[in-house]
Regions:
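Mature extracellular or lumenal effector domains of secreted proteins
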Residues: 34-191
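Residue-level detector of intrinsically disordered terminal segments
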Residues: 4, 24-26, 73
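Bacterial N-terminal signal peptides
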Residues: 18-29
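Bacterial N-terminal signal peptides that target proteins for export
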Residues: 4-18
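Residues at the start of alpha-helices and the adjacent loop-to-helix junctions
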Residues: 12-14, 27, 74
């Protein structure tokens, strides 16, 4: 059943997260929400938010975990893992895993595992959302236009208790692609 669309202004943030001895990649488009609008808090498919950022705007006390998201470019609400603690929250996970990443536009693995097992040994097996799903989360925003760039986070030690992070903009990228080793244009890296 198709959910009716709602209009909302959009604030965009690019994110990439690596969790639990893995490198994880995430990105999202973040529509601004009115503080009084609690109807789209992401707690159910009927209350799907347009982004993890909207979830955090509606509920500033939101914790990291699974939330329902739905943008005008998506055919139905879906659950995604939202990091609501890093830099004020609002980050959506689009990939995670330890080894075995693919550069396929179709992604890899069971997308439900991103929000069900974002960390720990269960997160070793790679899961990457399809490029179409990531583009739908961005809701028409190009990766190159994400003001915060891309955030990659990976476990620094085998126990997953210390983390290493790098951030960079992804330049001249009109649509999401997992083809990271090809001729990609990256901005400056910060650690």
């Amino acid at each position: 059943m198709k959910k009716p669309m709602r209009t909302t202004s959009h604030k965009t943030r690019w994110a990439s997260i690596a969790l639990a001895l893995s490198t994880v990649l995430t990105m999202s488009s973040f529509p601004a929400a009115s503080a009084a609008d609690t109807s789209h808090d992401g707690t159910s498919s009927d209350k799907a938010a347009a982004s993890c950022y909207e979830v955090k705007q509606v509920n500033p006390n939101a914790k990291s975990g699974a939330y329902w998201l739905y943008t005008p470019q998506m055919s139905a609400p879906q659950q995604f893992y939202c990091d609501q603690e890093t830099d004020g929250g609002g980050w959506v996970m689009v990939g995670r895993g330890r080894e075995g990443w693919t550069e396929s536009y179709g992604g890899v693995g069971n997308a439900d595992q991103l929000h069900k097992n974002p960390t720990g040994s269960a997160a070793f097996k790679p899961v990457q959302l399809s490029s179409n799903t990531v583009d739908a989360l961005l809701n028409g925003t190009k990766p190159q236009d994400l003001p915060d760039g891309m955030r990659l986070r990976r476990a620094y030690d085998p126990s997953g208790t210390q983390w290493q992070e790098v951030r960079t903009p992804r330049l001249q990228t009109a649509q999401w692609s997992w083809a990271m080793s090809y001729a990609q244009h990256w901005g400056p890296f910060t650690f």
